[in-house]
């Protein structure tokens, strides 16, 4: 099964047999903005303070940098850190949408290796659920799949992602797609309805409190021969730098995390952790006796 969007270029549209989606349609509808406002609000720039709109599920955020939002209160406990993702409002809804529309070719390429009919697919730390979005916009109308999304409970980009995926399922009449919404709690990791056959955790691990606990929870719920797509961004920072949402606790576990990955998975892609530390890799779960 291969996934190939008709026009995955920077200025293109996404055409399905049922509907044509313009580049920022979902943001424009959910947040009542123009395409120009969507692009401006989601384009990364140093020191920027976008005026982010509110929605039915969040308040507006304006005159603050990303760093200002992080520094607005202490971020010492799991609850403090999770609150950051609520405090940022629609910031990640816009930023991640703009970024991942530019990564559409990559989505297509990796999903060819991860997706087949009848599987239970999980997008962990999903943000706006870009990989799940690509699946739903690319699959045949009769395609059978369970999709589970997980992110911080109650954060705006997670709520936006849920709305977006449900809208695509309804628009396209995807009757054989089952969507499962599994939030991550400050002191509780999600449990899934079925064994996970394929999981994506993309640009997430550097933000989680404990990558090792996260991986353990995932491994315990994976099917034999399950596939894992991951990356774990490594920043070169001074010891006393404020890492913000790139958590020190996550960075401290990076080495042991990859030891655990190599003990439990076989690397399928040709980019090792040593040669390409910030690369995106695909692994297959080992079947242990």
Where are these regions (language model features)?
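Conserved N-terminal segment of class I S-adenosyl-L-methionine
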Residues: 2-192, 215, 229-287
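A conserved beta-strand element that flanks and buttresses the S-adenosyl-L-methionine
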Residues: 200
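Hydrophobic adenine-recognition pocket in adenosine-nucleotide-binding enzymes
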Residues: 204
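Di-metal (Zn2+ and/or Mg2+/Mn2+) metal-binding site signature of metallo-dependent hydrolases
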Residues: 207-211
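A short glycine-rich, Lys/Arg-flanked "PGG" loop and its adjoining helix->strand segment in the class I
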Residues: 213-227
């Amino acid at each position: 099964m291969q996934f190939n969007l008709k026009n995955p270029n920077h200025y293109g549209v996404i055409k399905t047999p049922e509907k044509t989606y313009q580049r920022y349609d979902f943001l424009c509808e959910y947040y009542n903005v123009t395409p120009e406002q969507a692009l401006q609000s989601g384009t990364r720039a140093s020191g920027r303070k976008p005026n982010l709109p509110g929605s039915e599920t969040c308040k507006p955020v304006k005159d603050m940098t990303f760093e200002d939002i992080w520094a607005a209160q202490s971020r010492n406990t799991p609850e403090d850190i999770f609150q950051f993702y609520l405090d940022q409002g629609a910031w990640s809804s816009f930023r991640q949408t703009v970024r991942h529309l530019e990564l559409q070719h990559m989505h297509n390429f990796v999903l060819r290796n991860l997706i087949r009919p009848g599987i239970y697919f999980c997008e962990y730390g999903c943000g706006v659920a870009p990989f799940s979005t690509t699946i739903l916009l690319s699959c045949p109308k009769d395609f059978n799949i369970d999709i589970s999304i997980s992110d911080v409970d109650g954060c705006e980009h997670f709520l936006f992602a849920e709305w977006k995926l449900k809208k695509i399922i309804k628009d396209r009449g995807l009757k054989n797609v089952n969507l499962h919404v599994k939030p991550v709690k400050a002191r509780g990791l999600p449990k899934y309805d079925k064994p996970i056959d394929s999981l994506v955790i993309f640009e997430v691990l550097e933000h989680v409190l404990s990558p090792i606990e996260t991986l353990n929870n995932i491994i315990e719920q994976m099917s034999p021969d399950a596939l894992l797509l991951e990356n774990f961004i490594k920043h070169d920072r001074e010891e006393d730098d404020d890492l913000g949402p790139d958590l020190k606790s996550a960075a401290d576990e990076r080495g042991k995390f990859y030891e655990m990955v190599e003990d439990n998975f076989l690397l399928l892609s040709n980019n090792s952790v040593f040669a390409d530390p910030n690369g995106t890799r695909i692994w297959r779960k080992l079947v242990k006796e």
